Amino acid sequence: MYLINQNGWIEVICGSMFSGKSEELIRRVRRTQFAKQHAIVFKPCIDNRYSEEDVVSHNGLKVKAVPVSASKDIFEHITEEMDVIAIDEVQFFDGDIVEVVQVLANRGYRVIVAGLDQDFRGLPFGQVPQLMAIAEHVTKLQAVCSACGSPASRTQRLIDGEPAAFDDPIILVGASESYEPRCRHCHVVPTNKDK
């Protein structure tokens, strides 16, 4: 999968919540470290669910990360000795993230990004669709539907145990208490007038 003759490319890891995106990002970063490559990991400041300075998977795996407020802040932390740039929760970054990732790949870095490809409504989320379009490698992971056990490609937001309405805020950082994986058929997004 990674037989590329020239340095610099983009890998996207996407899927619903609880599909293993952060776990896969951590796995890839650790593999590069075993190969004596230099990697740096970034995360958005907004993601402080488990740790402010680590990327942490839902099952507890973690790797040190640099929290940044804006996409272009990433450039301040890049050195020539770096081989791999990893970015978790990429859907929370501003619109400049696509350009930042392109520039890094064009400079010869292997760039690995992970994030939700759909928001809780089942619509494309943030800049992830654009990143998928320009990536050399896209890995779409699925979870298991918490309602029926089928493969889950969507994220259900729950508020007091009930599905969130379509016009609720898009970004609400949470974990198992407010989100669960759902398949296409069990994913429900009512309008406020339906509630």
From Swiss-Prot:
Keywords: ATP-binding, Cytoplasm, DNA synthesis, Kinase, Metal-binding, Nucleotide-binding, Transferase, Zinc. GO terms for biological process: DNA biosynthetic process; thymidine metabolic process. GO terms for cellular component: cytosol. GO terms for molecular function: ATP binding; thymidine kinase activity; zinc ion binding. ATP binds at G15, S16, M17, F18, S19, G20, K21, S22, D88, E89, V90, Q91. Zn(2+) binds at C145, C148, C183, C186. Its EC number is 2.7.1.21. The active site is at E89 (proton acceptor). It catalyses: thymidine + ATP = dTMP + ADP + H(+). It is found in: Cytoplasm. InterPro entries: P-loop_NTPase, Thymidine_kinase, Thymidine_kinase_CS. Transmembrane segments: none annotated. Its main location: cytoplasm. PROSITE patterns: TK_CELLULAR_TYPE. Homotetramer. Belongs to the thymidine kinase family. This is Thymidine kinase. It comes from Bacillus cereus (strain 03BB102). The gene is tdk.
